[in-house]
Design a protein with these regions (language model features):
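Histidine-acidic metal/acid-base catalytic patches
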Residues: 1-2, 8-29, 73, 98-100, ...
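Glycine-rich, proline-tolerant flexible connector loops at the mouths of alpha/beta enzymes
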Residues: 32-52, 107-114
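Short beta-strand segments at enzyme active-site cores
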Residues: 32-33, 62-67, 100-107, 162-167, ...
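Conserved radical SAM core fold
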Residues: 35-38, 69-72, 109-111, 226-232
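Catalytic-core regions built around general acid/base machinery
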Residues: 47-58, 146-156, 211-214, 246-250
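Active-site acidic/histidine proton-transfer and metal-coordination neighborhood
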Residues: 15-17, 56-57, 74-193
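Metal-dependent catalytic neighborhoods of phosphoester/phosphodiester hydrolases
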Residues: 42-48, 77-82, 271-273
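N-terminal substrate-binding region of glycoside hydrolase catalytic domains
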Residues: 22, 26-44, 66-69
Length: 290
């Protein structure tokens, strides 16, 4: 979200490399990288050595790779098959970067939005949506497509030695913890789990310590941001109303050992806010002996 907030969706290769330099200058050594469509994936893949060399030179690593292909949930079987092939290419790129996890989204169903469609052109928060359900839309059919695609992606990820995770997001097919648990149950794989995104789940009025308890060992990765519990803004931790100590006590109890990604964006003085977020998490970790 850092590079996207500063340089667009998706950022160009030049801006991506600049973002890596800036993130490492701020003291971060574990990085998440996204591929937001087939063209962006090709650009990253064609310049994989350049990206890897830059990370290595700065003592950084790409721990999570996030390919975003909306056609994974298309009603058109040919489009879905193409998206699956692109996902496999993405897993190969994740292997090149020595990533530990590969992540995607569950996307927005084919509804009719009168105005802005969530996450289509940009990542924006606090929007009011106007939605119409098309006469031919059937949730059961869409859910079956989603589950099938997630199963296929999981098999590919597993074959490449990668854990596969999905992020519940406001405005998408899986938008809360219980929907995520339903998807985990449907996919039926020990290799498949969740990204606990604090900003999105808090905006869904969830009790985050309970969310962590529900997901338990199925939490593979964490996105850290804060908000007021009404809008899904992604502010630095401490600027909203999340019970951070309560959440981290549960994460400690369930034995979470993965990465915490500072996932703030679309805020003034982003670099300063990133550094403050990092310090907040470090102090909390020291306090709770994480």
């Amino acid at each position: 979200l850092y590079a996207i907030s500063k340089y667009g969706y998706p950022p160009s290769l030049k801006k991506t490399l600049k973002g890596v330099r800036e993130m490492t200058d701020l003291g971060f050594r574990a990085i998440e990288l996204e591929a937001i469509n087939s063209q962006n994936l090709r650009e990253l893949s064609n310049n994989r050595e350049k990206i890897r060399e830059l990370c290595d030179s700065r003592g950084a690593s790409i721990v999570n790779f996030c390919p975003i292909f909306r056609d994974l949930v298309s009603y058109d079987k040919r489009k879905r098959s193409k998206a699956i092939r692109l996902f496999e290419e993405a897993t190969e790129l994740a292997n090149f970067f020595d990533s530990e996890t590969i992540q995607t989204d569950t996307f927005t169903p084919p509804l009719r939005f009168e105005g802005e469609t969530p996450y289509k052109e940009a990542i924006s928060f606090g929007r009011q949506l106007s939605v119409r359900i098309p006469p031919d839309f059937r949730w059961q059919k869409f859910w079956a497509i989603l589950v099938d695609s997630m199963r296929r992606c999981d098999r590919i990820a597993q074959q490449h030695g990668l854990k596969f995770c999905v992020e519940p997001r406001v405005g998408e097919s899986v938008s809360n913890t219980d929907a995520m648990l339903r998807l985990i149950e449907a996919v039926e794989s020990s290799n498949f789990g969740a990204v606990l995104d604090t900003g999105h789940l808090h905006a869904q009025k969830e009790i985050l310590p309970l969310s962590a308890e529900k997901l338990g060992k199925k939490i593979f990765y964490i996105h850290v941001s804060d908000n007021d519990g009404r809008d899904n803004f992604h502010l630095r931790p401490g600027k909203g109303t999340i019970d951070w100590e309560g959440l981290f006590r549960v994460l400690k109890r369930i034995g979470f050992q993965g990465y915490y990604a500072v996932d703030i964006g679309n805020v003034p003085s982003l670099d300063d806010e990133m550094v403050k977020s990092k310090r907040f998490l470090e102090r909390l970790g020291e306090k709770l002996k994480l």
